[in-house]
């Protein structure tokens, strides 16, 4: 059951400071290990901090892909020239996914809500918005919180998106979050969770899991949970997603792995080349895929 059964929040319950909304218990949230980890990671996340220091003549300012690349996966299937009223992004980071959707897919919206637990990443999203002006006609609302309760009315969001996020969220919180998504998304709305779940059957993850059991005190606090396709479907069904989005797909990513490419930060020789060479048969894709995406259908 979602926490919203007992508590209902709105943005009026948050404090707006320098373009970011903060919950009333932000000082308490700042003391959690999970937030401290992501604030630290956010400072240098995938080199995105370079947007804050590059000169006016830098090619990065002319070509966003030099900063972020082009996210693939389900985003390749996203329709062109779609327009919606409201977009909610869970784990927005510095805005990589909406930047791509705005520039390459011409997705348009009137309101964009971005939620992330990392304040440094939200501050960087503001800078990315200034530099590239994605969703040029939209109101922007950035919210620094853990997203256990979404501060929106029932049936108020047209499109919920997320990119490579849910493997970082503890399982009970993820289940609550999916119930919240089912609450706030409009009937007939859309969701796209690209590469958002790690695959529990992937050989690479199985090796990592074995190593973590050997040294449990030094487990990576970032990657918290893995799922099978059927478990993901069960989470979505139990959350009530089908009452709003009757049809959806859970599909394996096209990134496959039989070997970890790093262990405890140490590169494994030839692992990347071996993983990139994999071309599994259809029957093996769900086993060898690094993760899963889930999205409502049709994407139109």
Where are these regions (language model features)?
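N-terminal, positively charged/glycine-rich alpha-helical extensions of SAM-dependent methyltransferases
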Residues: 2-54
